[in-house]
Amino acid sequence: MIIMEDVTKTYTSGVPALNGINLHVQKGEFVFIVGKSGSGKSTLIKLLLKELDPTSGKIYVNKKYLNKLTRKKLPYLRRDIGVVFQDFRLLPDRNIYDNIAFAQKVVEAPNKKIKSRVLAMLSMVGLLDKYKSFPNELSGGE
């Protein structure tokens, strides 16, 4: 379970990345973080993986309060969160559809549900026509 309560992240340069974010993700739920360039997607993920600390607000993952989590416990936290990144973290021997479906197959989600979720997500980000493409056939932003 992931909970973000009134999370704000402002970089030292003064650039605000996130402002007052509230997010609740239940155990077993799949969430896709999509948005325009510069909208804070990467910052949000880095906060959840504790690569960054919030300027204000609270973050919990599996009832662990990230704001106080020690470096020693970080690997255990990160094992509990499945993240698919857009940059070079896709499986090169699988097409885009299979890359997106992979995590859901691991937790044995029903095939019918996997198909509908993957197609809906691809449609949402404008890549439905590229579902058979491999990672090396897409641009960095795709």
Language-model features, listed with the residues they occupy:
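ABC ATPase NBD coupling module
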Residues: L66-G82, N111
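Signature (C-motif/LSGGQ) region and adjacent switch/coupling loops
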Residues: T70, Y97, Y131-F134
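Short coil-to-helix segment of the ABC ATPase nucleotide-binding domain corresponding to the Q-loop/switch region
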Residues: D93-A103
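Conserved ABC ATPase "signature" region
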Residues: K64-Y65, A101, K105, K112-K130
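Helix-to-loop junction immediately C-terminal to a conserved catalytic motif
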Residues: L49
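Conserved ABC ATPase signature
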Residues: F134-E142
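The feature captures the beta-strand-to-loop junction immediately N-terminal to the Walker
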Residues: V34-K36
